[in-house]
Structures are given as structure tokens and as C-alpha cells.
Amino acid sequence: MKVIIAGGREKDGLIYGYTLQEMWVILRDYMHELRYHGPGRRSRTYVEEVISGCATGIDSLGEQWADCNWIPIKQVPADWKLGKSAGIKRNILMGDYAKSTGQGALVALHDGVSPGTKHMIGYATKIGLKVHVHLVKAKTE
């Protein structure tokens, strides 16, 4: 199945207050759980391709995860010449691409606040993708 991996962006080397290394561990462990255990034996997620929005942060960690697992990556960068709607349009393109083979999924690491990730979750739900949201409590110092 084609799987979008999305979430917050990196700012000053942090995502939701966590280092890239800490977020890598969260993503890696969550993907392992989905692929090999899932909420039930029949619901394990077979990942044939990872879809990335090419943003720094969770998107780039998703690409690294795909590389480490020998999984092809489909990059769908935002066309910022379109202005502020570029991120939303990219999310729609990613969702439609994931759905194009009949099955698709979204894995979102979300703090519950990020508007781009919130939109991706809503759109993926609307078009019938399997949606897996891992809520990440923002870490404050």
C-alpha cells in the first residue's frame, strides 16, 4: 500500500520540541508497530511506497525510514509559486496519489495543533485512506 508519512516541521533542529534523533525513534517504533503488529493480525500495514511532501521534519524522517527499509519514495513537493495554498494543494495531491491504487494510508505524527498536518488528516479521512495518527505531546523545556 502507498503510505503518506507526514507531520510537523523542523525548527532550530527540533520537531515539537524533540531532537531529530528522538523523533526518528518515535517514527521508527511506530512504523514497526504498524508493519509487524498492527491493532490486529489482519490490519498489519504493508508499505510498498512512501509518499513524502518533502518538508523538513517528519516528511524527511519518513524518507530516511523508507531508505533504511528499501522502500521506494514518491516525492510530492509543494509548489510555493501558488502562494499560501501550496501546502493544502500538495496534501490533496498526496492523498489522491495514495488512493490511486484503491488502498492507501496516512501515518501522521501530530501535536494536535499543526494546521498542515490537521488538514492532511482530515483530507485522508474524507477520501477513505487508512489513517494512523500518533499524537506527540509537545516537549517543553
Residue ranges and their predicted role:
Residues K2-V3, G7-E141:
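Acidic/glycine-enriched connector segments
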